[in-house]
Amino acid sequence: VEWVSANPTGDLHCGHARNAAWGDSICRLLEKSGYDVLREFYVNDAGNQIVMLGESLISRYFEFFGKEYPLPENGYHAQDVKDIAADIAREDGDKWLTADASERLHYFMKQGIDRELAKIDRDLKLFRVNITSWMHETFFYENNMKRINDCLKMMDEKGLLYEKDGALWFKSTDYGDDKDRVLRKSDGTLSYLTPDIANHVYKMERGYPIMVNLWGADHHSYVTRMQAALTALGYPKGTLTVELIQMVRMVEDGVEVKMSKRTGNAITLRELCEDVGVDAARWFFVSKDITTQMDFDIKQASTKDYDNPVYYAQYAHSRMCSILRNPEIPQFHREDNYGRLTNEKELQLLKMIGEFPSTVAKAAKTYKPNTIAEYILSLVKLYHSYYNVVRVNNPDDPELTNQRLGLVMALKTTLRNALDLLGVDAPQSM
């Protein structure tokens, strides 16, 4: 599964957060279903944006020492760029003021990538997202672009390429694309598609026959050309699934909030976690289908009442835990028959517990973690209504009490497992 894959040029923002939560939950669902999942972040570190990052850092580095160095027209102005430049200045001193320009740019580009990725990894871990593979685009340019050239050779041998106007083209229209695509431009540089094809071929070579990518909705046209390339190379249909994620609007009291009140910049993933909590952020991002634009209600996500669905779900779990640790209720002992559970709500709850495995299987197969969120809300709504009308502890009927304790234990386990699939904690008390 390849997801997030934000450019290493700044902090993760709320759009990345939706991608991160959704993709991580897909990984959890697939792992729960028995798949060996590679959690991959594709690092776009070979494009012009990295040169702009390096030049921007140099400009801020010079500024730190009271010197002038022009900030590129398309450079990066964010505070984190200033912070990284200041860190380099404090660590290295002023030696880069008079260094060879090429060596200096290479150094600042590498420092920028490494430090930005370290922050991205830190923030993803805060968000309970664990990346196990960081695949750099520059990897495919190593050893005189061996992997890219091998890929182009394979395509050429299959008759998939032709030259026109000094450029190398892929016959992608033969495989469902609306026009043929340039792989190598007339000036000799590669298009973004070329190393990306090599990247996907390399995934297959590493033993991952199923690939799931999560991309922003603005990459819609890119899906067809990538699938065309894999089909042309002989990989089975369905090898690559691309989930397109629509945009997020942060709203408060019905009004869109575009900037952080603290920094005046776009709201970052870290700020969101600090403001509403990881549990609420994860829940809200995975509870709405990614095929539609979502409004993230900051105030609703921050409340500690039943209007907040994640609070509603977590409170059900804490209620279950409270019953099970109540010293006035006899300790549960396992039974072979639970025939005393005849209350209508008890039968409905038992049915829902039984449906959990198939719900997980469906969510994993369709890559739809919101299916689990919907299941959780149905389960806890039924449980809260049961809790309000049925006494678990009946001193005059220890057999019924014990069977109801068994039901509560099964509900607790099911709810905890369901919440974990979404990366949401299941607190024992609230």
For each predicted feature, which ranges?
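Non-catalytic interaction-recognition regions
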Residues: 1-430
